[in-house]
Amino acid sequence: MVPTVSLEPTGHSCWDEPLSIAVRGLAPEQPVTLRTALRDEKGALFRAHARYRADSHGELDLARTPALGGSFSGLEPMGLLWAMEPDRPFWRLIKRDVQTPFVVELEVLDGHEPDGGRLLARAVHERHFMAPGVRRVPVREGRVRATLFLPPGTGPFPGIIDLFGVGGGLLEYRASLLAGKGFAVMALAYYKYDDLPKVIDILHLEYFEEAVTYLLSHPQVKGPGVGLLGISKGAELSLSMASFLKGITAAVVINGATVNVISTLYYKEESLPGLGMHLERIKVTKDGFKDIIDILNVPLEAPDQKSLIPLERSDTAFLFLVGQDDHNWKSEFYAREASKRLQAHGKEKPQIVCYPKTGHHIEPPYIPWSIAAPHSYFDKPILLGGEPRAHAMAQVDAWQRLQTFFHKHLSGDKRPSPAKL
């Protein structure tokens, strides 16, 4: 019998969907190596491999059979995706054009040889970032530069603004995936994109207020408020928006600081200075990464208290998703302080979910973990923290939790989302 690869769903799926992988037609107990590869839009090659042994019927199902070694070991049905590593140092897998899929090649090789044995079977699978029927609408309204993703149908849908960090530009992959779950999601750029500022030393909340107004006025967006989804600097900005602006019902804060960092933030007659930092506190790891976790001043001490975001003004529901090994900044500390501050002012206690051995970039499911990555403000890659498997598990859980949270607070219901390792 000729070996064949079985993938479910067949042919294509959304990136955040689990993929069932099985091989049939092998010899009983046959040792094989499974290998995956994809290229991103910049030409970087991402690969993973794992060694397996077929069962007594010559079949191999990754949901039931543990890997014996390779890029990972143990029972990891999605390991061949989340364990991928780039052929370029410190290169993160980022989908830049969500209108095209990542094409994943899967090969089955005979034996457990490091360089691969005879090719037994091969399959190609497309991993899409826009579910069928999701619409992509570029937004250039007033000063707002963004892309709005709308689910199939007429709506109205609960609205979310999606914000990333200091890398700048316009990243759409999280918004496009989330639109497939029934949300109208606007990926919002705020610098280093189109005619927006090229630097981030000054930010005006009026720009973000304009984005909120635009989204709430859209005929396919359900009011009375919108949700915010932010990571890193985007999470910090989400907290500022929730504190100063109207129309924010719920906010998911992924590894964010409850203090204004790097830039000076202005809103009308008020301003928050950037928190002081000491670059001499940077440590360099044995691998040559910069560990910046200790460079920020403690915002609870004068004069740095002026940089604290006035969360007590907000009536927004908050969900903090925290990587406990985040080395970008002390995310768990900031989440705990936010909870204390909100409760001290009679506000609702926020949800805080902490993930052990999880680093800074908590992404949608199955996006590979990175130990370190370049940073706009440093000349060497900075340490992001985390461990591959724990980080992968955290991403699956966080993706489910944020959807449930938004459905609860923006739609008034609670829907589970199918995702698993």
Swiss-Prot record:
One of its GO terms (molecular function) is fatty acyl-CoA hydrolase activity. Highly expressed in spleen, brain, testis and proximal and distal intestine; expressed at low level in the liver. Disulfide bonds: none annotated. Its EC number is 3.1.2.2. It holds the Pfam family Bile_Hydr_Trans. It is an enzyme of class 3 (hydrolase). Keywords: Fatty acid metabolism, Hydrolase, Lipid metabolism, Peroxisome, Serine esterase. Pathway: Lipid metabolism; fatty acid metabolism. The keyword Hydrolase applies. GO terms for biological process: acyl-CoA metabolic process; long-chain fatty acid metabolic process; saturated monocarboxylic acid metabolic process; unsaturated monocarboxylic acid metabolic process; very long-chain fatty acid metabolic process. Gene3D superfamilies: Acyl-CoA thioester hydrolase/BAAT N-terminal domain (2.60.40.2240), alpha/beta hydrolase (3.40.50.1820). InterPro entries: AB_hydrolase_fold, Acyl-CoA_thioEstase_long-chain, BAAT_C, Thio_Ohase/aa_AcTrfase, Thio_Ohase/BAAT_N. One of its GO terms (cellular component) is cytosol. Catalyzes the hydrolysis of acyl-CoAs into free fatty acids and coenzyme A (CoASH), regulating their respective intracellular levels. Mainly active on medium-chain acyl-CoAs. Seems to be involved in intraperoxisomal regulation of acyl-CoA levels, but not CoASH levels. May have a function in termination of beta-oxidation of fatty acids. This is Acyl-coenzyme A thioesterase 5. The lineage of its organism: Eukaryota, Metazoa, Chordata, Craniata, Vertebrata. The gene is Acot5.
